[in-house]
Amino acid sequence: MKFLELADLDTVNNALSFDADDCRIRGKCELYTTKSTNSDKKLFKAIENRCQEDLFALSSSKSPEYAFSLTQQSPFGPLDQSSSRRTFMYIVATLNASYPDHDFSSLQPTDFYKEPSLSRVVDSVNSTLNNIGRGRLSVNGIWEIIDRHINLSDCSVYSYTPDSDSDPYGDDALIWGMSYFFFNKNMKRMLYLSLHGLGKEVSGRNRYGNDDDSVFTPLADDAEPSDFDDDWVANMDD
């Protein structure tokens, strides 16, 4: 995956990292193309081999329950289809790129969830930002910038909710977290959006997983009103 360094997304990244009343918020908004790096190719080969082994076991299995679980219950679609496996690989590669000190290659497709509606995801992020005192950002800037780069209405959205042992912030007094992947197949782009609430004593981390105490620059309070109003949210899944 190739990380796209864009000034407006950097602004969103900065705005999503701040101190709330009872915790520190560490957010990410990162855009990647699906162009494979050498490490991605190794990862894809390993995942593909694992999936092929599962498919071989399926062909040898007489259990209809096992057959159903492999071909129907993946959030990415039937895993006997290469397009489904490829989407899963892109998401794992995105996590590896975003957190290079962690290895997510052992994740399974069932560790993820396909969100049924874009509006529900937007509402969830907006509600979280409202609750922690950054509600204006969600309406006046974030979604407009994201949509500009990935065309939200054309995206499939997946979520990842790991346990504390698997979460990259699990050792950092993690209180809560949310992670979403917006995949636009036609544009060959993946956007990773996450918010994590950490205990007050924990320092921030930059996108490379290192300590980062830099001061964030929030989106301006007097920014132009966004087109992404309540009506837009209500109709985005049409």
From Swiss-Prot:
**Which keywords describe this protein according to UniProt?**
Cytoplasm, Nucleus, Repressor, Transcription, Transcription regulation
Show the GO MF annotations: DNA-binding transcription repressor activity, RNA polymerase III-specific; RNA polymerase III core binding
Which residues are in coiled coils?
none
Gene Ontology BP terms: negative regulation of transcription by RNA polymerase III
- Composition-biased stretches, type Acidic residues, lie in 221-238
User: Which cellular component appears as one GO term in the record?
Assistant: nucleus
* Region span, Disordered: 215-238
Could you tell me which Pfam families the record lists for this protein? Answer: Maf1
Looking at the keywords, is Nucleus present? yes
Cellular localisation = Cytoplasm; Nucleus
Q: What does this protein do?
A: Mediator of diverse signals that repress RNA polymerase III transcription. Inhibits the de novo assembly of TFIIIB onto DNA.
Q: Which family does it belong to?
A: Belongs to the MAF1 family.
The UniProt subunit note reads as follows: Interacts with TFIIIB subunit brf1 and RNA polymerase III subunit rpc82.
Q: What is this protein called?
A: Repressor of RNA polymerase III transcription maf1
What would be the name of the gene that encodes this protein? maf1
